[in-house]
């Protein structure tokens, strides 16, 4: 009897160990299957497989704010290839649910530093929009920077010209078993969180309205302004509209003023403050001294108008002379002025934007030259013309009386 009891106990233990062994083997097999599925998908991303990339990160999802969609082009595929060229991963843990219906794989992903890339992208996009705005105002180009294609061209340019550092992201990949008891079939669940993790948080960073601070945003405005050519600058700042003269005169004076900006403009951001969706950035602006230009112009104009030549020249020549004096005063100016300017920016939920950008920058740079000094000289010229006409009438009356 004792022998039978011992045998039964022994067989029970052996059966239990066998069952545990089989269960453990199945569990390890499930873990291996899950890991294999994840590894296969991530390897395809690592090997720059376009189809896998679009399966997890649809190209339209990266820039949901783009106004004009486009088909998936080779250029867009190249952009994703550039982004994933430093992609790598390391599986750290696999957890399979007790019923084998779900699994979670913990992965450490290595991608390009998305925060730096997103900041560069937003700055380049704003720079492009400012330039296109200047070009559009002079009628040479339409605003196309908001299209999906333009967004990818900017991203492609940044990835081609910059060597970005890498960053690591901890990611949990969820899988579900879509098979049956006889044959398991593990499938990765595609989620917004996974989509963003695979690009290192780039989608969230691009959507961050504060990715560029108010100071960073103003820096883009001012740096871009310095690089605009004469026509773009005068168009963007509305300099042409400052001068109430003929087109030729407008262009000449506007070009002279823009050249003064190129030679003298500089800035130093001193401080900033935020209040909700509003920010004020105090900036030290160095620019040409408009008061000095106007003083020189007025002095030379007064001297000319007091001369006999002004009476003899007639109204048209007086106008041409006053224009010549103003142009020379601008071209000959070497005096600069330094002033603190408070720039107001507003966050519209997408990014920080300079309020009334063209006029704000124009007033900060041109100062008292925001109004045309030629308007004053035109009034003075009318007075001279009236005095001349009166003198002519008086002379005519005197001659008639003598006769």
Q: Model segments located where?
A:
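Sec-dependent N-terminal signal peptides of Gram-positive bacterial secreted proteins and lipoproteins
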Residues: 3-29
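Core segments of small alpha/beta cavity-forming domains
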Residues: 28-82, 86, 198-270, 292
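Hydrophobic beta-strand residues in large extracellular and virion-surface proteins
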Residues: 38, 89-91, 103-107, 173-175, ...
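Primarily extracytoplasmic ectodomains and periplasmic/lumenal surface modules that are beta-strand-rich
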Residues: 51-52, 112-114, 230-231, 288-289, ...
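Short glycine-rich, low-complexity/disordered patches
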Residues: 56-63, 166-171, 235-250, 317-325, ...
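Surface-exposed, charged secondary-structure patches
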Residues: 74-158, 253-329, 384-391, 399-403
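Short beta-strand edge/turn micro-motifs at domain boundaries
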Residues: 116, 123-207, 303-317, 333-383
